[in-house]
């Protein structure tokens, strides 16, 4: 807070500190202002507060928002002679961060890019620390180094997807990943031991997965995927397996619940004839029906991917009215990825039933476990 009682952002304080280090050197001041704009406006936009914490974690340790100014004052912007060099370093990593944020990874012509797209599909940011470190090391690296970096990305993805599917939160590894990312960056110090260092990082990630226990088919098959981003991430695992090597995947596909979250009464009546009885239902039966609704609606067997425009147009329609609209557009049905002729595929069924959803979930969960851990 300044002498007028106004709160000043840590970012503004940091900028003033950098300019102060330039002294009366107008050329140096102009260079700082130009770099600052490039980093915090052009590259990062509104995501600068996350970046400055994650960047510091790569250099030193993970920090909280309240620590930002003090740590940057004491560790980063503490030397007039090197202020431009450090800003250029920030600029370089802000580009890496921006790529993680936008999903700018190119075509699916390598396992490296595919692993990045999988991480991006989780809609989490905790992996950005490792993403930035990997981007930095992968530039002009030897093929064998790229291979180990790819393995590290895959292991990171397994941790993230396991965490979100099992409902462990979205930032469980926010302090753990920077430690591993720092080791990745430091591996370049000695080319003779670089692979050994990367092997240790990979082993650390695999050990962490063992601690929290890897996903099983039962986890996926029975999970109530109420959070759309979690179910969407699982569907994207399968979608990315179908995209051609020379093609950039569509990142804007949205999750569709075939049995909608707010299903019309007539549609539920048809689905729930197997539950037994006719309305009006008793309180006990109503509770049972509502539980069954959730088990169906938020089941992986009830999920597909489609464009956001089509998603809004089919909305709460029953399956009989949805299916013609599905057939008019590009719809990603996980079952069709497993087998084009499968009798569980959306295009091959006339009714969307409880038994069908459960069978689809079994088939999809088996595929996902193999795909995630291969």
Q: Where do the language-model regions lie?
A:
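Flexible coil/loop and intrinsically disordered segments
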Residues: 1-374
């Amino acid at each position: 807070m300044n002498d007028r009682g106004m709160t000043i952002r840590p970012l503004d304080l940091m900028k003033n500190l950098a300019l102060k280090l330039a002294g009366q050197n107008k050329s140096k001041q102009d260079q700082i202002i130009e770099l600052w704009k490039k980093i915090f406006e052009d590259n990062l936009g509104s995501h600068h507060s996350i970046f400055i914490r994650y960047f510091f974690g790569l250099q030193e340790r993970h920090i909280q928002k309240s620590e930002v100014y003090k740590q940057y004052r004491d560790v980063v912007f503490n030397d007039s002679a090197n202020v431009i060099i450090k800003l250029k370093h920030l600029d370089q990593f802000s580009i890496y961060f921006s790529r993680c944020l936008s999903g700018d990874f190119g075509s699916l012509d390598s396992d490296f890019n595919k692993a990045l797209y999988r991480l991006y599909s989780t809609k989490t940011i905790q992996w950005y620390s490792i993403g930035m470190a990997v981007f930095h090391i992968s530039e002009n690296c030897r093929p064998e180094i790229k291979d180990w970096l790819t393995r590290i990305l895959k292991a990171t993805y397994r941790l993230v997807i396991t965490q979100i599917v099992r409902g462990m939160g979205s930032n469980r590894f926010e302090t753990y990943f920077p430690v591993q990312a720092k080791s990745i960056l430091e591996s370049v110090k000695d080319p003779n031991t670089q692979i050994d260092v990367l092997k240790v990082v990979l082993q650390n990630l695999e050990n962490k997965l063992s601690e929290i226990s890897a996903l099983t088919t039962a986890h996926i098959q029975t999970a109530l995927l109420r959070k759309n981003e979690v179910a969407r991430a699982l569907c994207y695992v399968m979608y990315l397996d179908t995209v051609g090597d020379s093609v950039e995947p569509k990142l804007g596909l949205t999750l569709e619940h075939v049995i909608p979250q707010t299903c019309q009464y007539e549609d539920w009546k048809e689905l729930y004839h197997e539950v037994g009885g006719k309305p009006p239902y008793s309180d006990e039966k109503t509770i049972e029906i509502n539980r069954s609704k959730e088990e169906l609606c938020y089941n992986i067997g009830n999920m597909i991917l489609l464009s956001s425009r089509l998603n809004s147009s089919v909305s709460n329609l029953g399956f009989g009215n949805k299916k013609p609209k599905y057939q008019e557009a590009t719809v990603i049905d996980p079952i069709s990825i497993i087998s084009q002729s499968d009798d569980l595929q959306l295009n091959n069924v006339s009714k969307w039933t409880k038994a069908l959803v459960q069978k689809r979930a079994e088939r999809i969960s088996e595929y996902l476990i193999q795909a995630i851990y291969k």
